[in-house]
Amino acid sequence: MTERTLVLIKPDGVQRRLIGEIISRIEAKGLTVAALELKNVDDALARAHYAEHEGKPFFASLLEFITSGPVVAAILEGPRAIAAFRQLAGGTDPVEKATPGTIRGDLGLETQFNLVHGSDSPDSAAREIELWFPGR
């Protein structure tokens, strides 16, 4: 069964010119890029995307980071796309928990600047795709 997921290459990945490397790894994993856009994230989109973290101590810095520069937003498709991308991305903390061979394990520098976001469930994927690609 084909599944869809939202992936973001965060401002640190764009600034470090890792877009091509990350997309190459996604395609090598057998996932299809169904849509891709370079976006400047405004406060409203950032707040909607990270709504589950509102009220947490790191919320303000998360908003500041995601709006600090362009983001590449992509819809990926493929068998078990959500799990496949999350495995490819690696653990959230690139220094301590991300396995070598993953995007974060090989390229990440620290927890907040961990290069990519991937939806964590089918419900999250549907909600996030609608936020970033309305009507798709």
UniProtKB/Swiss-Prot annotation:
This one is known as Nucleoside diphosphate kinase
As its record notes, the protein acts as a catalyst of:
a 2'-deoxyribonucleoside 5'-diphosphate + ATP = a 2'-deoxyribonucleoside 5'-triphosphate + ADP; a ribonucleoside 5'-diphosphate + ATP = a ribonucleoside 5'-triphosphate + ADP
GO annotations of cellular component type: cytoplasm
GO annotation (BP), single: UTP biosynthetic process
Its required cofactor(s), as named, are: Mg(2+)
Q: Which residues cross the membrane?
A: none
Organism equals Mycolicibacterium vanbaalenii (strain DSM 7251 / JCM 13017 / BCRC 16820 / KCTC 9966 / NRRL B-24157 / PYR-1)
Gene Ontology MF, one: ATP binding
What are the alphabetically sorted keywords of the record?
Answer: ATP-binding, Cytoplasm, Kinase, Magnesium, Metal-binding, Nucleotide metabolism, Nucleotide-binding, Phosphoprotein, Transferase
Where does this chain mainly localize? cytoplasm
Functional summary from the UniProt entry = Major role in the synthesis of nucleoside triphosphates other than ATP. The ATP gamma phosphate is transferred to the NDP beta phosphate via a ping-pong mechanism, using a phosphorylated active-site intermediate.
**The enzyme's E.C. designation:** 2.7.4.6
Q: Write down the HAMAP family for this protein, in alphabetical order.
A: NDP_kinase
The family line of this record is: Belongs to the NDK family.
The gene designation is ndk
Tell me which residues this entry annotates as catalytic.
H117 (pros-phosphohistidine intermediate)
Name the residues that bind ATP.
K10, F58, R86, T92, R104, N114
